[in-house]
Regions:
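Short amphipathic alpha-helix segments
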Residues: 10-24
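C-terminal structural segments of small proteins and small subunits
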Residues: 22, 42-68
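RNA-recognition motif
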Residues: 32-39, 67-68
């Protein structure tokens, strides 16, 4: 399954790295984060809830404006 997380608050490549690391630490998640698109495209295997994805991004210091 693929989900797109819309993220606010990323300003630089370091932000992208922090957001990527936060998502990739979750078991079953492989994320590609884009500063330009202000999103993360996650390939998910297993049972990972939207709340888990949202909490990982918020814990990294960013805001989630939507998950599709």
């Amino acid at each position: 399954m693929t989900k797109t997380i819309h993220i606010e608050g990323m300003m630089c490549p370091h932000c992208v790295r922090f957001a990527t690391e936060a998502l990739n630490k979750l078991e079953g998640v492989s994320a590609v984060v884009s500063l330009e698109q202000k999103n993360a495209v996650c390939t998910i295997t297993g049972d990972v809830s939207d709340d888990t994805l949202r909490n990982a991004i918020v814990a990294a210091g960013y805001q989630v404006t939507g998950i599709e």
